[in-house]
């Protein structure tokens, strides 16, 4: 006798911020015996190797933004082509439910599912609902949120909102209970700096200049791990080598970033939803520099969730100067109690079972069809 095993189609834009929580959900669904397929865009090739999907469907996608009318029109045409691809995929896969994690690449498959009367679940990772999710919210059966308070949820959709938290990667969960490192006098001070592909440039410009301004006794204790763009790497390393630091490691990418976070006394980073959720999961204090220029200021809202509970400092990029950063580093490193209190505060915001909560919600929705 053939046993029917339901399939869930997970939709996520091909960047880590969308794909990592989608991947965590996929593992949780598979643990429940639910099959998973992934719909995404062409950018996914470099980071989808570990995604537990029995099939990956690449959908044409574009973002209809910018000032150019021709560019926006071209994006709409591309999205239309993606809708046709998505509709064929949804009919062929016949999913019990479709889950979207935001970004314009999710619009064609989510919209196709809604028009074909397949139940859809949205997951909004940020503290401000993105435009793609806002567009899809009206037709979604359930809207799951990564943060308790989320701005921009359409008024008619608020009754369908459920706070699940942001699904956490297994690599982060594996180090989530690592004790905060000792801050004994004269012990190493471990600083981790990263910013993603769009954020590493400002970190490479500001952080070295700030470290130069630290007292020599702090510099001698400082063990620095920093993400730097390939074009900035040599200059950044050479600059640090002349400062007499206790240790320096710079690289364009760290595969073991969760472990690096767990080893750090302090993190300086952007404030994407995954970063903020992982800082809370591991319990590490941070200086956060939200990515400027976003229309909805989602990273500023994300950073505020930790700043408001004393787990982080949020500094706008316009105020993120060497003098300001140096002053904050001295203040924190010379008052270790502030760091330990911030680390404890961060853990009060964590939801380690967010992937399981979301998987239960998806399974319940799929079973109701």
From Swiss-Prot:
The keyword Cell cycle applies. Keywords: Cell cycle, Cell division, Cell inner membrane, Cell membrane, Cell shape, Cell wall biogenesis/degradation, Glycosyltransferase, Membrane, Peptidoglycan synthesis, Transferase. Its main location: membrane. InterPro entries: GlcNAc_MurG, Glyco_trans_28_C, GlycoTrans_28_N. Pathway: Cell wall biogenesis; peptidoglycan biosynthesis. GO terms for biological process: carbohydrate metabolic process; cell division; cell wall organization; lipid glycosylation; peptidoglycan biosynthetic process; regulation of cell shape. Transmembrane segments: none annotated. GO terms for molecular function: UDP-N-acetyl-D-glucosamine:N-acetylmuramoyl-L-alanyl-D-glutamyl-meso-2,6-diaminopimelyl-D-alanyl-D-alanine-diphosphoundecaprenol 4-beta-N-acetylglucosaminlytransferase activity; undecaprenyldiphospho-muramoylpentapeptide beta-N-acetylglucosaminyltransferase activity. GO terms for cellular component: plasma membrane. It is an enzyme of class 2 (transferase). Its EC number is 2.4.1.227. Belongs to the glycosyltransferase 28 family. MurG subfamily. Cell wall formation. Catalyzes the transfer of a GlcNAc subunit on undecaprenyl-pyrophosphoryl-MurNAc-pentapeptide (lipid intermediate I) to form undecaprenyl-pyrophosphoryl-MurNAc-(pentapeptide)GlcNAc (lipid intermediate II). This is UDP-N-acetylglucosamine--N-acetylmuramyl-(pentapeptide) pyrophosphoryl-undecaprenol N-acetylglucosamine transferase.
